[in-house]
Design a protein with these regions (language model features):
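Left-handed beta-helix
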Residues: 1-7, 200, 204-399
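Unchanged
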Residues: 1-257, 364, 382, 387-388, ...
Length: 399
């Protein structure tokens, strides 16, 4: 049997501006998820378990934290002598200035190096979703369909606002039309931002669009042109898929992991999520602690009450403090008597004594950026956002 030469490109350069202070100073794929992991781990673990040996990560916005986490691909067994892991960093050249304006633009900027790899199939996926998917199934279906492109789609639950997605109309295994972020969606089937391409067909469309002066995101012009050619296949994903691109989705998507029958497992023995994580000591639960549906990462120290929440590495929750329906990132401190509800607190922040954040039944969570100090007795109502301390403030030691 002829071996298929497949290349997986993980798009990890997104800013994630809808997440407000949580992505100030870092790319969205570097955000923590489930306490121990980062969003990019999901895509890389899918690639590793799918036996894809050549995986490239395309970076752009704030790449430093993400680059450190990627550790040369070692946590995903991609640090190979031949092939394996590669980071595609942003660059300027004779044909391109500034940064890429979208996913399709990012592909055309990096096309020379992709083309030199000469893949039979180019699999492109985003790095900011919860998804378990064997990419080998996608590649096999793509080749069987002799398609120029294959869109991995899923049907969203009734009542979901799909206006921020690529809405897909398909039948008989073929995509008939796509509508990118429509104001009035006509269905609930959306693209999961996983695609397989025939490289020659993709290159032709990218060249034409680049010559015409506009690429942007894949759904704006690239996919509509491919669909118009009639050779785009639909691969229906029936499992769990969760976009974590808004504050509410980022919080609720993680709290779903705490259910007894969670729709997504980070610790599935057959498909574990792999990550790069420094060695830290075990979590400590003090005598005064009360826990109900709590995920505790290493080195957490809990003496207060935790309900339906994810507690990141090194987090300290003092006696008398309450944390409910929230996500606390690395090394957050919640002082005695403080109450945190429906909130996402970024790493290194300190919640002062008797401070009150959020409300248990609020739709919009409180967002606190990294290394902030919330004063004692402060009140932050639902939907409040605090930007991180700026780097120069950290250097000066100001508050």
């Amino acid at each position: 049997m002829t071996r298929v030469r497949a290349l997986c490109v993980v798009l990890a350069g997104g800013r994630g501006s809808r997440l407000g202070p949580l992505t100030t100073g870092r790319a969205k794929p570097s955000l923590p998820v489930g306490g121990n992991y980062r969003l990019v781990d999901i895509a890389l673990s899918n690639a590793t378990h799918s036996a894809l040996t050549d995986v490239w990560v395309l970076q752009q916005y704030e790449p430093h934290l993400l680059g450190e986490h990627l550790a040369g691909g070692r946590p995903w067994d991609l640090d190979r002598t031949r092939g394996g892991f590669r980071i595609l960093a942003p660059f300027q050249g004779p044909e391109h200035d500034g940064f890429a304006s979208g996913n399709a633009d990012a592909l055309v900027r990096n096309w020379p190096v992709i083309d030199s790899f000469d893949p039979d199939v180019l699999l492109v996926c985003s790095a900011d979703h919860l998804l378990t998917l064997d990419f080998r199934d996608v590649i096999a279906a793509h080749l069987d369909a002799a398609a120029d492109a294959t869109v991995v789609s899923t049907v969203m639950p009734a009542g979901t606002d799909v206006s921020r997605y690529l809405v897909v109309q398909a039948d008989g295994g073929r995509v008939r039309s796509v509508d990118y972020k429509p104001e009035s969606p006509t269905g609930r089937c959306v693209g999961t931002e996983v695609f397989a391409y025939r490289p020659a067909a993709l290159a032709e469309q990218l060249r034409d669009l680049h010559r015409d002066g506009g690429l942007g995101d894949y759904g704006e012009r690239l996919l509509p042109r491919l669909v118009a050619g009639g050779a785009v296949a639909d691969f229906r994903h029936d499992g769990h898929w969760r976009d974590l691109g808004t504050p509410t989705a980022y919080l609720d998507g993680q709290l779903e992991l705490l259910r007894e029958r969670s729709p997504f497992r980070l610790d599935d023995p057959a498909w574990p999520i792999l990550t790069s994580m420094p060695v830290r000591g075990p979590a400590i639960v003090r005598r005064t602690a009360s826990l109900d549906r709590a995920a505790l990462a290493p080195a957490a120290d809990v003496a207060g009450e935790v309900v339906n929440s994810i507690v990141g590495p090194g987090v300290v929750i003092e006696r008398g403090a309450q944390v409910r329906h929230s996500v606390l990132m690395d090394d957050v401190v919640v002082r005695a008597g403080a109450s945190v509800a429906r909130s996402v607190i970024a790493e290194g922040s300190v919640i002062g004594r008797r401070a009150m954040l959020g409300a248990p039944n609020a739709v919009h969570p409180v967002l606190v950026g990294s290394h902030r100090r919330v004063a004692a007795d402060a009140i932050l109502p639902a939907g409040s956002e605090l930007e991180p301390r700026r780097p120069r403030d950290l250097i000066r030691g100001t508050r």
